[in-house]
Structure formats: structure tokens, C-alpha cells
Regions:
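Bacterial N-terminal signal peptides
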Residues: 8-17
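Extracellular carbohydrate-recognition regions
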Residues: 23-57
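Beta-strand-rich interaction surfaces with strong enrichment in secreted/lumenal proteins
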Residues: 29-30, 92-98, 151-157, 187-188, ...
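Short tryptophan-centered beta-strand motifs in secreted/extracellular beta-sheet-rich domains
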Residues: 44, 106-108, 161-178
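Extracellular glycan-recognition surfaces and repeat-rich motifs
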Residues: 49-79
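Secretory/extracellular carbohydrate-interaction modules
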Residues: 73-145
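Short, aromatic/His-centered strand-loop micro-motif at the edge of beta-sheets
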Residues: 144-164
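Flexible glycan-contacting loops in extracellular carbohydrate-active proteins
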Residues: 186-213
Length: 221
């Protein structure tokens, strides 16, 4: 069991105990915030929680404690025949973690399948095409909507392996941490601009599944 899965199990047990014995939920673990409320946590042991997740492609399912997204079609020809168009073919799994608070902390364990990193993939958007985090060998790039970029190094950032990712957000400030190494970004372009979501995208050629092992979201004060 990975450390993120173990921590999720601890959080889930504490939350269950709090309902029975009125124990306070675990405190927020944050570089930016002193307090917050745990609003969602999931180890994917049941059906997909559609309050928090919005699938943008069709082939998403919860299997054996994992949320897994796969391509809707095996190749371009099959997709174009089925959809009768040449764009938005569903070859790259896409999903959104929705309804983010204006100030939040999210911790997750995610894996991107693939043969090699490519320009702009795999990635997730903070807001709708506003701020983008793109993974690459042993690191990532944060690109703000005005074009400003921040490079980040992190250990063991590889395809086909689990990544422990933490984000802390409030307007003007973003803490990002990958596999235990983080950085604080302060910039006026750190905004959501009305779209409170994280959107995950990957390659269009197989192997290209996206997998989530656990996620926890706090509303920060």
C-alpha cells in the first residue's frame, strides 16, 4: 500500500469515527493556510462521486480501488467513423475535479500511462485553460494564462508510476508539490477566472490511461 493510500485510509477512518464519536476531522496540512475543512475524500471503493467528478470522455470506471480513464476508441479511424467528425475524438481520456472552493488544498495520487513525455502532455489545468501544470522527466512546468512559466524539479516524475501531487490555491498564490518537493508561486495571474475545476488530460496514442488512487480536498479558511 502506497503512502498516499495509507494516509487516505487514516483520513477515512477518522472521518467515520467523527460521525460516531463526534471527533473532529483531521486538520488541514498546508503551507498557505492555518485552518480548513475536509469537504471530500475518496479511495474509490464505490461508484464515482459525480458531485465532484465530471467525465469529459466516456470510458471512465472505478475498478479495484482505482478511478481509471481509457480512450473511447482504439484509433482515429474508428473514432471518426463513429462520431462523423475529425475533432474531439475521445482518444485522450479527460476528466474534471469540479466544485473547487475559492481557497483549497487538494492531495492526490495519480498515474499517467505512456511511452514518453511529449510537449504539453500529460497535464492538468487549474481553472478552464487558465493555469496549466505539465509533467516531464523528473519535474513539471507551471504555465500561467498570461504566459509566465515556472519550472519545477521533483524526484521520480515518470510515466507509468504513481505521482503524489499536492496543490494549495488562493488568488495570487499557488503551492505545488510533487513527490514531496514543492514550490510557492506568487503572481497576479494565479486565478481560476470563474471555473473552479482541475481538468486532467493526457496523450492521444496508447498506452494512455489516467489512474487515480486517492484524492482529498479541503476548503481553506
Amino acid at each position: 500500500m502506497g503512502i498516499q493510500k495509507f494516509l487516505f485510509a487514516v483520513v477515512a477512518v477518522i472521518m467515520l469515527a467523527s460521525r460516531v464519536h463526534a471527533v473532529d476531522p483531521p486538520p488541514i496540512d498546508s503551507h498557505l493556510f492555518q485552518s480548513g475543512e475536509l469537504v471530500y475524500t475518496d479511495g474509490f471503493d464505490g461508484p464515482l462521486n459525480k458531485k465532484w467528478w465530471q467525465t469529459r470522455t466516456k470510458n471512465w470506471e472505478v475498478v479495484d480501488g482505482l478511478l481509471i480513464g481509457a480512450p473511447d476508441y482504439k484509433d482515429v479511424a474508428e473514432a471518426q467513423t463513429a462520431l462523423k467528425r475529425d475533432h474531439h475524438l475521445g482518444l485522450s481520456p479527460v476528466i474534471r475535479l469540479d466544485n473547487l472552493p475559492s481557497k483549497f488544498v487538494v492531495r492526490m495520487r495519480v498515474k499517467f500511462e505512456g511511452k514518453e513525455f511529449k510537449t504539453g502532455r500529460p497535464k492538468f489545468d487549474i481553472g478552464h485553460h487558465i493555469n496549466t501544470v505539465t509533467f516531464r522527466d523528473n519535474g513539471y512546468v507551471v504555465k500561467l494564462h498570461g504566459g509566465k512559466q515556472f519550472l519545477g524539479k521533483a524526484p521520480d516524475v515518470k510515466l507509468n508510476e504513481w505521482l503524489d501531487v499536492a496543490l494549495e490555491f488562493q488568488e495570487g498564490e499557488l503551492w505545488i508539490e510533487v513527490n514531496g518537493k514543492g514550490q510557492l508561486i506568487k503572481h497576479e495571474q494565479v486565478v481560476l477566472e470563474g471555473r473552479s475545476e482541475l481538468t486532467f488530460k493526457t496523450f492521444e496514442d496508447a498506452p494512455n490511461r489516467i489512474m487515480f488512487d486517492s484524492v482529498s480536498l479541503w476548503k481553506a479558511n
